[in-house]
């Protein structure tokens, strides 16, 4: 099955969102574009935009490849996507509030109780705890794939600590530096105000104990974390402190950070530390990344933690398979954005089907991320399929399977000119007293020809994403 090309489909020819860009592109000298690609790489190296790769003996720091051909969406396409994203985010927040309180969806049998109760991402410590302003998922990254002109599907809900937004911002800034004339010719909706929107959104969910303008900080695990650049970047762009666990302590029932003038109360903590490491008195006792006693402060309502502890259950891949039911249960309407069909390997009939068709399917770990721990059947060897089948049979509940979809393609610039590569899209959503969706998001691209894996940890790159102001 041929993939749908978002710029130049085989059937209909050049699509309207790309018309103005295509006219400009045809006027360009190929040598100039090649030079601009090299300029972009120099910009990223100078800025220090890297990510860490674990499990490799070589240097752990990598530059994420950037392609200068933008992905372009019309305003109409974006409006439809935002409607579906907003509906889904509302349902996710309602689901989290429900499972940590009344558990109506479990009592109704729409989601199996054991799937929640036995899930390692479900935190019993959060039962009965309502976060300030009732918001659990303050920042969400919804991964979306496209199959055809009008078919978009949600691939994954990143409701814990979604990353990549710094690349979205730097991609746009770099494109505007390299091609200022393009942004004069084509009206593209801005993304550069994201840090200000993020700060405003976090301030809007401050706890009632906050006095005056809330003090906000970004909690990072430290410089060895793969996304440390982003943590520092966002703190700097928002004009707030970047802190580590060792900088914080509980003082008089509040979390406070160490300053030259003593300890200062923190009202909102945008944490990029996983749940298990957040509080050694509540979770992992060996954690040096969190703050001893912070969960007591949180339960007392004296700090906002974004995202709330326990939100990981909402982006669990087994829970994902129930998202159509979850959306309908809490919104009363069918999901605007559908799911990719999913086989739950914990179910005997599904496991049987998956084992029989393993070479045709994409199989993922329920708690996996970053493209690790997955099998792309059509790209795997017979031996790899056999070895993965043993894992499935040993722990079927650890896996889900999905059909291998022909993800849409967008052109990238290669030595031989433009060439199509598969892409996905991660729009970023901010939730406070309202839902705000950044126009565009991060387009991830599988740079290897024929590959469907877009994750940067697996060799993927990124593109600037344009939403036309039409």
Where are the regions a protein language model picked out?
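Preference for protein termini
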Residues: 1-470
